[in-house]
Amino acid sequence: MLAFRHRLAWRVAPKAIRFVARLLWGFRIEAEAPFPEPPFIIAANHLSFLDPPLVGAAWGRRLKFVTLADLFGNYPLLDFTLESFEAIRVKRGTIPLAAMRQSLAHLAEGGVVCVFPEGTRAARWGEVSPLPGAAWLAVRAGVPIVGMAAIGTDLVFGMDNKLRRGRVRIRIGPAFYPIGSGRAAVDDLTRRWSEWMARATHPDTRSAGGA
């Protein structure tokens, strides 16, 4: 049974985050397509520390984030928050076998897993090549990837970690389903998701409205 603090976190946090983000930055959620039924993987770009809470708020229900282990052990409040949202730890520079097992188990239970394939914050999309982990999980579990593009978070809370005024959005893309198996399927799925992300975050499309 899900622990009380996990249930409480997901009951309260998404609404609170959406409210505060709308108040500060005119936060909007733009959907190109409806979410598929779980299980699935959310794969998002990573411009800012704001991205995980805004992505979680856009989904609005329980999910498990794959999170760098470096974030733990620095601030007790951050540790408590990450643990309340059941973050799956990945140690930098290692093969994340434990994280893979935990992610696959959660997907097998009908859950949603969120991965940031760049593996770290980047000043802009395309600066860091995405890693294949999200696509590998999708192919292995036989579930789709849903793209989420964070837009504007780098302008209001970027690499210098200073808050600024601006507009932020989360754009929700279509579901990308694995085709085939093995490395070819992983590469194909990574390519399709990356191409969508490049379009969603391109300056010519960033200002376009959503559904």
Label for each model-derived stretch:
Residues M1-L8, A98-A211:
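Non-catalytic C-terminal accessory region of glycerolipid acyltransferases
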Residues A9-W10, P14-H46:
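Helix-to-loop junction immediately C-terminal to a conserved catalytic motif
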Residues A13, G73-L77, V156-G158, R165:
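Short, glycine/polar-rich helix-capping loops at beta-to-alpha or helix-loop-helix junctions
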Residues A16-I17, S84-V90, P117-R121:
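Short, basic, glycine/proline-bearing loop/turn elements
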Residues F19, E32-A33, V55-A57, D79-F80, ...:
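Short secondary-structure boundary/capping segments
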Residues R22-L24, G60, D79-S84, R140, ...:
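Short, well-ordered coil/turn elements that cap or connect secondary structure elements
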Residues L24-R28, T94-M100:
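Glycine-rich, highly charged phosphate/nucleotide-binding loops
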Residues P36-T94:
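Catalytic core of membrane glycerolipid acyltransferases/transacylases, capturing the structured
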